[in-house]
Amino acid sequence: MPELPEVETVKRGLAPAMEGARVARLELRRQDLRFPFPEALADRVSGRTIVGLGRRAKYLLVDLDDGNTLVSHLGMSGSFRIEEGAASAMPGEFHHARTKDEKHDHVVFHLEGQGGPRRVVYNDPRRFGFMDMVRRADLAAHPFFRDLGPEPTGNDLGAAYLAERFRDKAQPLKSALLDQKNIAGLGNIYVCEALWRSHLSPIRAAGTLVTPGGKPKEKLGLLVASIRDVIADAIAAGGSSLRDHIQTDGSLGYFQHSFSVYDREGQACGTPGCGGTVARIVQAGRSTFYCAACQK
């Protein structure tokens, strides 16, 4: 599943090709992805101008000039490919190379704009992705978004906010951080990395980072800073390039080579002077990587 940095990378790669362009035709090559397409989606998008691209959590937002927003989720293996004539480029790559097999091309944006015609192709072998059309004014109240917490790099995420959310919680810290109601867009990879950077165990109770009076402990502030830093580093690196996620220009992001604990089971911990070994455990069906020696 793509995490926030991967979706942000895709958004930034698509923006030069899509923003300001007119959708001459939206071509749907099947009736559904994970869910059926909205009724008359092709007719509603064709002829419209794309006024901007955005992102909320792990969702890509395509704003149209009629006040509607096309909401897209990449699912497990979705990717976008930009084609201009015989040339093609892809924004976001990840461990297993994404396929360019045209039999998995399910949605094609035929665009007109400066620089001539181009196509933006959505490819999704597993078809776990989906698209929906939402009035822009209604986005915040839509079921996809209404319960989401603040963005991990936004001003609303702070130690005081997390103290309020975590107070008296016996829930494991990692599970609390993955709860999208607490923080939007934060996923398994970056939670593992942020916990390592802040020397916090994924299995400790979230409430242990809050004083009896409800104030954040010092380590909670360090955790917030680590979350911000690891997300910013991954975005700057173009995403983690893990498994199925490809950048629009086809380049391999380098953040995966900077992982400190994720997917490093049995390797030495990188904390200076630690001497511990990265371990893998399973929490709520997901792999957790951490160093028990320095993460407490």
From Swiss-Prot:
The keyword Lyase applies. The active site is at P2 (schiff-base intermediate with dna), E3 (proton donor), K58 (proton donor), R286 (proton donor). GO terms for biological process: base-excision repair. DNA binds at H104, R126, K169. A zinc finger (FPG-type) spans 260-296. It comes from the Bacteria. Keywords: DNA damage, DNA repair, DNA-binding, Glycosidase, Hydrolase, Lyase, Metal-binding, Multifunctional enzyme, Zinc, Zinc-finger. It catalyses: Hydrolysis of DNA containing ring-opened 7-methylguanine residues, releasing 2,6-diamino-4-hydroxy-5-(N-methyl)formamidopyrimidine; 2'-deoxyribonucleotide-(2'-deoxyribose 5'-phosphate)-2'-deoxyribonucleotide-DNA = a 3'-end 2'-deoxyribonucleotide-(2,3-dehydro-2,3-deoxyribose 5'-phosphate)-DNA + a 5'-end 5'-phospho-2'-deoxyribonucleoside-DNA + H(+). GO terms for molecular function: 8-oxo-7,8-dihydroguanine DNA N-glycosylase activity; class I DNA-(apurinic or apyrimidinic site) endonuclease activity; damaged DNA binding; zinc ion binding. Its cofactor is Zn(2+). CDD domains: EcFpg-like_N. Its EC number is 3.2.2.23, 4.2.99.18. Binds 1 zinc ion per subunit. The keyword Hydrolase applies. Monomer. PANTHER family: FORMAMIDOPYRIMIDINE-DNA GLYCOSYLASE. Involved in base excision repair of DNA damaged by oxidation or by mutagenic agents. Acts as a DNA glycosylase that recognizes and removes damaged bases. Has a preference for oxidized purines, such as 7,8-dihydro-8-oxoguanine (8-oxoG). Has AP (apurinic/apyrimidinic) lyase activity and introduces nicks in the DNA strand. Cleaves the DNA backbone by beta-delta elimination to generate a single-strand break at the site of the removed base with both 3'- and 5'-phosphates. This is Formamidopyrimidine-DNA glycosylase. It comes from Rhizobium etli (strain CIAT 652).
